Amino acid sequence: MSLLVKICGLTTPETLGAALDAGAEMVGFVFFPPSPRHVGLTAARELGQQAKGRALKVALTVDADDATFENIVETLRPDLLQLHGRESVARIRDLKQRFGLPVMKAIAVATTADLVPLAGYADVCDRILFDARAPKDATRPGGLGATFDWHVLDALALDRPFMVSGGLSADNVAEAVRITRAGGVDVSSGVERAPGVKDCDMIRNFIRAARAAEELSVQ
């Protein structure tokens, strides 16, 4: 199976265009005001139109309420909901029934103990994203440039597709893929020159490095 590449936290037509032209399969838009990558609904509508038919549109939320989801779904028309908060299994099941969209749940990882809730989420989610656990004093759950010990996933037995994120860059994505055997990689801060400011060349370099890692993994 081909390695999926997701560029998350896109906010401008230029950087979205770079991701699409370089072949990203997924493009992520953040709907969380504390994040420097937050996009408003008007911008999301325009970016969604630009991405339509070229990549899967992913809406990232953090413990959002029903009204927020309704606005996002109506405006962006996402292909996938990415839940990055403390959403329960019951909440995820309700969202899937309500909107009829697949869900990717982010699991914050530091040690193998963080994998304990995975079984419940795997039953209801279409895809799992393993991300580095944020520090206790962090104001947002991801996009902080921190990695986690990828060997935590060594004994992983999961019947759902999964991706990895957290501190990925063009320099380490090959190692992440080699160790985790993930089906996809998700990057945000690793393709930025400042928080929330994506760099087109860094996006291209990351995708190029991910493709090289994919080729090595099938040899």
UniProtKB/Swiss-Prot annotation:
This protein's record includes keyword Isomerase: yes
GO molecular function, one term: phosphoribosylanthranilate isomerase activity
Family membership: Belongs to the TrpF family.
UniProt entry tagged with the keyword Phosphoprotein: no
Native source organism of the sequence: Bradyrhizobium sp. (strain BTAi1 / ATCC BAA-1182)
Keyword list, A-Z: Amino-acid biosynthesis, Aromatic amino acid biosynthesis, Isomerase, Tryptophan biosynthesis
EC number(s) from the headed UniProt entry: 5.3.1.24
CDD domains: PRAI
Stored Gene3D superfamilies: Aldolase class I (3.20.20.70)
EC class (word): isomerase
Pathway participation: Amino-acid biosynthesis; L-tryptophan biosynthesis; L-tryptophan from chorismate: step 3/5
Protein name: N-(5'-phosphoribosyl)anthranilate isomerase
Pfam families: PRAI
GO biological process: L-tryptophan biosynthetic process
Catalytic activity field: N-(5-phospho-beta-D-ribosyl)anthranilate = 1-(2-carboxyphenylamino)-1-deoxy-D-ribulose 5-phosphate
